[in-house]
Amino acid sequence: MQKAKINRLALFPILLLGGMAGLMQGGCSTEECYDNRNALPYAGFYGVMEGKMEQISVDSIRVYGIGAPGDSILSEGNRSIANLYLPFRIDSDTTQYVFKLINKLYEPYNIADTLTFIYSREARFVSAACGASYVYTIKDIKTTGLLIDSVAVPGGRITNADVENIHIYFNTGEDPDYSEDDE
């Protein structure tokens, strides 16, 4: 019986192409979840400054969740912030946060505001690799009104779009200028 001779140089391009195809296939499944698949509420802070509504930075404000498992402090209050991620609970239709002034001037007065989001949540299948994500439809937003004047969710839904989807309007002690003349 005669053995067939295999030309190893002829097999090299075939093996190389097969290996590259395998690497590319594995790369597709890992890159599938790089995009933002979860609805993560992103809040921007606003206030009236010199008669105009504009984005503001808030100094010395601690933000933490109520009833959240583990460490729920989202801002220690040790730096000025103009926006913040406020994750919603997926095991409940309500999420609450406390916004508390902690600077030396206001701390003795214990000035804090509780912000409550009431929503419905809808799980959406993304893929086998990524699992599911949630979309939140806002039903109501409540605040105790000490620091926060009002809150808006433009569109009423929080999806996985990478945008500021919550506007928190702080009391700044100024009233907005509603005049149409900018003279």
Give the residues covered by each predicted segment.
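Sec-dependent bacterial lipoprotein signal peptides
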Residues: 1-28
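Short N-terminal leader segment in a subset of presequences, especially plant chloroplast
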Residues: 8-13, 38, 139-143
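Generic detector of solvent-exposed, compositionally biased contiguous segments
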Residues: 12-16, 23, 79-81, 151, ...
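Bacterial Sec-dependent N-terminal signal peptides
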Residues: 21-44
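Extracytoplasmic cysteine-anchoring/structural motifs
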Residues: 28-35, 87-183
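Residues that flank catalytic or metal-binding motifs in active/ligand-binding sites
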Residues: 37-39, 59, 82, 113
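Structural motif
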Residues: 44-56
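Tryptophan-paired
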Residues: 57-108
